[in-house]
Amino acid sequence: MLQIGEDVDYLLIPREVRLAGGVWRVISKPATKEAEFRERLTQFLEEEGRTLEDVARIMEKSTPHPPQPPKKPKEPRVRRRVQQMVTPPPRLVVGTYDSSNASDSEFSDFETSRDKSRQGPRRGKKVRKMPVSYLGSKFLGSDLESEDDEELVEAFLRRQEKQPSAPPARRRVNLPVPMFEDNLGPQLSKADRWREYVSQVSWGKLKRRVKGWAPRAGPGVGEARLASTAVESAGVSSAPEGTSPGDRLGNAGDVCVPQASPRRWRPKINWASFRRRRKEQTAPTGQGADIEADQGGEAADSQREEAIADQREGAAGNQRAGAPADQGAEAADNQREEAADNQRAGAPAEEGAEAADNQREEAADNQRAEAPADQRSQGTDNHREEAADNQRAEAPADQGSEVTDNQREEAVHDQRERAPAVQGADNQRAQARAGQRAEAAHNQRAGAPGIQEAEVSAAQGTTGTAPGARARKQVKTVRFQTPGRFSWFCKRRRAFWHTPRLPTLPKRVPRAGEARNLRVLRAEARAEAEQGEQEDQL
């Protein structure tokens, strides 16, 4: 008997419910008809000082059990593993059933019991169902006769041609379904993918992601410089080397659209070959590794850039025609911008000044220029090719002037080596007036795989460390060098822990009274072991 709340749809209430005793029939009336009855009932009960529960209890007591024929003990069925539940005497359930209750588990499984009862008339015996939680499988606890037995037998016979069972329905978590487009465009290279990724990641995160990231300290150049380093270390090597950070930043947004789709072949350069190449180059010019520290990495950078870029341009012949002297001249140009005052004098220096001017102009131009293609054509070459070509085109006299420049530059280096403090100051000044010069150097360095190393050395140069001192790689020490380190190597381990062991001597040192012969001890131990074995056998 259910008491129905006002807002319940009467049709939602199940006709029968599987509960403890078996299947219970549910009697309910629509609320409207019953309202008066309920009111009268409650009123009466209030007057009597009773509650609904009391009524239920009394009715329960007054209902006699339906007479049950004594069950004849039939031989135990092997199939039933679940103990049949002891059925309590039928009770009158006084429950309230309204929309808050509507989804209750035991009520909502009334569909199952309904379709069972639909099989209908041929079933003589009332079926007792187990609550679902006790019912292992469909067949496990089923106590039903006849048709279920037939089903069982059929299932047993059918078990050979078992259909591949569908895996149990699992609760699905909605994962994003990967979409595969069929029109795979040109596959992005690793660099391009990284570039695309970089363009979407915020600058702070990027800083955290790029290992060994260290900006070059420099007052004048601030944010633009930082951003350009970011883009570089993100590997924007395809951005034209001549461009200044200004428009390289402009490009960084659309970098992920690979501009140079016909990518030219670049030799793969790993660190070893890179260092070797740098050694070969710095050695003949006679400027050791110190240049790199002195000049804030600039001269060495331009050279290193040359090395890589000229492999890259395929203009190797034309570049090396100038030989070391040519590169030296370029380094000198770099320096000439730092200390342009002392180098303006004299007819030979005149031409060099022209080259330097040319460089400075180009840099400024590039800063203004917008068209990336045009940047790529002149930008990449302008520092390198044009300076060099101008020098080479003028007359053979150039060679002489270059050589003198070279020497003068080395002289300057030597002076600087003697006074590292001065060099620090120099560098500071150079960086202060760095505007274009630093940018030019940056751009030359854009493609160099040595970015990080160059930056380290540059930073050293800035702080004014001694020129010879270069960033050393820290040596890892072997942690435990104790003599026992390899002892495991020679020890015989027992392969099987379970095999009986030979008896071992007691660990503690025997006290003075006990200090007996080792032989005696051993004999005792052996006797004990044997006794143990005998006991085991017994």
From Swiss-Prot:
<dbReference type="GO" id="GO:0000226">
    <property type="term" value="P:microtubule cytoskeleton organization"/>
</dbReference>
<dbReference type="InterPro" id="IPR026526">
    <property type="entry name" value="Coiled-coil_p8"/>
</dbReference>
<feature type="compositionally biased region" description="Low complexity">
    <location>
        <begin position="428"/>
        <end position="438"/>
    </location>
</feature>
<keyword id="KW-0206">Cytoskeleton</keyword>
<feature type="modified residue" description="Phosphoserine">
    <location>
        <position position="261"/>
    </location>
</feature>
<feature type="compositionally biased region" description="Basic and acidic residues">
    <location>
        <begin position="357"/>
        <end position="373"/>
    </location>
</feature>
<dbReference type="GO" id="GO:0007088">
    <property type="term" value="P:regulation of mitotic nuclear division"/>
</dbReference>
<comment type="subunit">
    <text>Component of the 3M complex, composed of core components CUL7, CCDC8 and OBSL1. Interacts (via PxLPxI/L motif) with ANKRA2 (via ankyrin repeats); may link the 3M complex to histone deacetylases including HDAC4 and HDAC5.</text>
</comment>
<keyword id="KW-0242">Dwarfism</keyword>
<feature type="region of interest" description="Disordered">
    <location>
        <begin position="58"/>
        <end position="128"/>
    </location>
</feature>
<dbReference type="GO" id="GO:1990393">
    <property type="term" value="C:3M complex"/>
</dbReference>
<feature type="modified residue" description="Phosphoserine">
    <location>
        <position position="142"/>
    </location>
</feature>
<feature type="compositionally biased region" description="Basic and acidic residues">
    <location>
        <begin position="301"/>
        <end position="313"/>
    </location>
</feature>
<keyword id="KW-0597">Phosphoprotein</keyword>
<dbReference type="GO" id="GO:0005737">
    <property type="term" value="C:cytoplasm"/>
</dbReference>
<feature type="coiled-coil region">
    <location>
        <begin position="349"/>
        <end position="366"/>
    </location>
</feature>
<feature type="modified residue" description="Phosphoserine">
    <location>
        <position position="146"/>
    </location>
</feature>
<feature type="region of interest" description="Disordered">
    <location>
        <begin position="213"/>
        <end position="473"/>
    </location>
</feature>
<dbReference type="GO" id="GO:0005829">
    <property type="term" value="C:cytosol"/>
</dbReference>
<feature type="compositionally biased region" description="Low complexity">
    <location>
        <begin position="321"/>
        <end position="332"/>
    </location>
</feature>
<feature type="coiled-coil region">
    <location>
        <begin position="514"/>
        <end position="535"/>
    </location>
</feature>
<feature type="compositionally biased region" description="Basic and acidic residues">
    <location>
        <begin position="381"/>
        <end position="392"/>
    </location>
</feature>
<comment type="function">
    <text>Core component of the 3M complex, a complex required to regulate microtubule dynamics and genome integrity. It is unclear how the 3M complex regulates microtubules, it could act by controlling the level of a microtubule stabilizer. Required for localization of CUL7 to the centrosome.</text>
</comment>
<feature type="compositionally biased region" description="Basic residues">
    <location>
        <begin position="119"/>
        <end position="128"/>
    </location>
</feature>
<feature type="compositionally biased region" description="Low complexity">
    <location>
        <begin position="458"/>
        <end position="469"/>
    </location>
</feature>
<dbReference type="GO" id="GO:0005886">
    <property type="term" value="C:plasma membrane"/>
</dbReference>
<dbReference type="GO" id="GO:0005654">
    <property type="term" value="C:nucleoplasm"/>
</dbReference>
<keyword id="KW-0175">Coiled coil</keyword>
<feature type="short sequence motif" description="PxLPxI/L motif; mediates interaction with ANKRA2">
    <location>
        <begin position="500"/>
        <end position="506"/>
    </location>
</feature>
<feature type="compositionally biased region" description="Basic and acidic residues">
    <location>
        <begin position="405"/>
        <end position="419"/>
    </location>
</feature>
<protein>
    <recommendedName>
        <fullName>Coiled-coil domain-containing protein 8</fullName>
    </recommendedName>
</protein>
<keyword id="KW-0963">Cytoplasm</keyword>
<dbReference type="GO" id="GO:0005813">
    <property type="term" value="C:centrosome"/>
</dbReference>
